[in-house]
Amino acid sequence: MEDKNILYGPEPFHPLADGTAGEQMFYALSRYADISGCIALTNAHTKENVLYEEFLKLSCRLAESFKKYGLKQNDTIAVCSENGLQFFLPLIASLYLGIIAAPVSDKYIERELIHSLGIVKPRIIFCSKNTFQKVLNVKSKLKYVETIIILDLNEDLGGYQCLNNFISQNSDINLDVKKFKPNSFNRDDQVALVMFSSGTTGVSKGVMLTHKNIVARFSHCKDPTFGNAINPTTAILTVIPFHHGFGMTTTLGYFTCGFRVALMHTFEEKLFLQSLQDYKVESTLLVPTLMAFFPKSALVEKYDLSHLKEIASGGAPLSKEIGEMVKKRFKLNFVRQGYGLTETTSAVLITPDTDVRPGSTGKIVPFHAVKVVDPTTGKILGPNETGELYFKGDMIMKSYYNNEEATKAIINKDGWLRSGDIAYYDNDGHFYIVDRLKSLIKYKGYQVAPAEIEGILLQHPYIVDAGVTGIPDEAAGELPAAGVVVQTGKYLNEQIVQNFVSSQVSTAKWLRGGVKFLDEIPKGSTGKIDRKVLRQMFEKHKSKL
């Protein structure tokens, strides 16, 4: 008998469609290619556009080029590039053929690249002109890499082909896309992508996502409750890195809906707001650290953002306070939150637009189940009891690439995946993230969630960004400490900040480890606070027990 405290997703608005992720992508692109002038991608920095018609033809020609080059099903390619118009072409061509694609961060240093590429051993690395030199340096140390292809140049560089020349040399410019046919294979087993975990709890691991995992995400994207109503030409603006799971699977889903994806490779406040206005953007993707910026920005009122209907937040927990401030500033009905891991393909908890609860990260999505488990006893907990989240369903990864030990540590024999995150759900099944299990600060036996204190700090009118960590202390175990960024022209001191927090929380959450005033909070490439680096800034602290 199933435990009554296991929660299941609702019936899907769209059942899982037949076919592989490549077949579904091909048929979707074909449909939108027939709409005259339908734009697939816009580079917000350069204003360049790519039409769905062109996007489809290039992806098919690249797939044919892969075949002529000699790539076969289960061979691997890698992509190391910032967000760009060409980023998804090798990925979609790979989906067509059953080739495995491995996106890696353009921010990786050579040591990190060597580690990640060494897991999947790609035959080809696609890069940008910005990452070319770094990738070239790495290639000399990786004998399995046969060649490098530069995505965003129109001419070859250093003896290596640009994407346009590779396609021209290996495929017919007059290719009839209506005669192109993606390969068919077992979507349940065939790996589509290897995404790399963030490595915040150790070295990064290769997360194997199957075609079925991706197809389930496509279904959610078309769901009007958990995703979007299908409306070609709807404009989306994203600054989320495409190599990140949130940016990757969400954007792939957008293509199946025929949306116009306006991309940014770096966040620039004025350009972001200008793009929202110019492209009449209806939905945008942000991480919470960027969300915190807008409630206090003087620029927001200078732009016409009347088309904006939704801001979607993911990648890290969003505090209730910031969510409410952003909603009010942009005059939105709600801010859509999502919660997921690289290992769950995409968000498995999403705010349903029919039932919004401030501070909640959402409800369990179709095709999935969730339970909250006591980390100590293993007991399945009920409503309003805090424990670790476990998930099961169609978007759970196949395994870690060539790492059976790590796979067994995160997925149990019954197929439940441990999230490593602490949360609870209310009586109506809305979930609330407390913090990472490993991020919790242990103060005199009490567990303190950094995200809670960060949410309070960001309520202060002079604080534009904040990060909280625990620093070692012999007497207490760990002391909560905060780094804060103060608004230009405003003044705060340590005592003011400590008093502001202590007036709103229990004594275990006081900032006894101190406060540091920083120019910026240390963060990773996806905007998550790097608590390890932040902790190092507090090595010389004074206990204030």
Curated annotation (Swiss-Prot):
One GO BP: bioluminescence
Instruction: Classify the source by domain of life.
Output: Eukaryota
Mostly located where? other
Q: List the disulfide bonds.
A: none
GO cellular component term of the entry, any: peroxisome
Signal peptide feature range: none
Q: Which UniProt keywords apply?
A: ATP-binding, Luminescence, Magnesium, Metal-binding, Monooxygenase, Nucleotide-binding, Oxidoreductase, Peroxisome, Photoprotein
ATP-binding in keyword set: yes
* Family the entry assigns: Belongs to the ATP-dependent AMP-binding enzyme family.
Main role?
Produces green light with a wavelength of 562 nm.
Protein name, entry field: Luciferin 4-monooxygenase
Organism from which the protein derives: Photuris pensylvanica
